[in-house]
Amino acid sequence: MDAIKKKMQAMKIEKDNAMDRADAAEEKARQQQERVEKLEEELRDTQKKMMQVENELDKAQEELTGANAQLEEKEKKVQEAEAEVAALNRRIQLLEEDFERAEERLIIATEKLGEASQTADESERVRKVMENRSLQDEERVYQLEAQLKEAQLLAEEADRKYDEVARKLAMVEADLERAEERAEAGENKIVELEEELRVVGNNLKSLEVSEEKALQREDSYEEQIRLLTQRLKEAETRAEFAERSVQKLQKEVDRLEDELVHEKEKYKAISEELDQTFQELSGY
């Protein structure tokens, strides 16, 4: 009987131990289940976050693509402005060459005027000494008149040439104004591009990337932004250089206009002197 009681007690103890182990196993299973659910929830959150990051990165890529297109357009406009400046330089050079040729003609006309004046003085002296040789004097006067007419024709030709130079200068001024307007538009566009790139940079900096691949892509985008910013600065520098070139050309045009006015005044004085000489010779 005692053996049976001991055996029953042992079985009860074993049963209690088994129940305790079962409860412990059940608790452990419950904890494992909670851990699995928590991990699944974290995984879902991570997946959502990754999808959000991917969407934001795609949006940033689109913005960078747009910025690249705008930058290429700006560089194209800067190249066009530089080409216009080069064309203006060539036109200024041609105008200077025309101006030099006109100056040479002016010198020739002035020399002929001096010769005509000297000839007129000589004719006056001969007329006083040899009043009886009227026929020879008259022939001499005709020669002087022909020389004076030739000098007047040269002066008129030079005047027409200077009028042509003035028209060309007016065209150059119009071209310069258009180039200045394009340079100003280019500067405004650069400011807009810089603002857009600043917004893109701020958006990229606000992204929270948790995976190594996303971090690498963000670094790549930041490098692209840095390169774009550098290219924008270069384009801005080129635009400023183009503007300075336009200002320099404007000063050169102003100088040529002043010289043109001065030379016209000289031609006017020569023409008046030629007319006066012609009248004096006609009086003889």
UniProtKB/Swiss-Prot annotation:
Disulfide bonds: none annotated. Residues 1-284 form a coiled coil. It comes from the Eukaryota. Residues 12-38 have a biased composition (Basic and acidic residues). Residues 1-47 are annotated as: Disordered. It holds the Pfam family Tropomyosin. Keywords: Coiled coil, Repeat. The keyword Coiled coil applies. The keyword Repeat applies. Belongs to the tropomyosin family. Tropomyosin, in association with the troponin complex, plays a central role in the calcium dependent regulation of muscle contraction. The molecule is in a coiled coil structure that is formed by 2 polypeptide chains. The sequence exhibits a prominent seven-residues periodicity. This is Tropomyosin. It comes from Trichinella spiralis (Trichina worm).
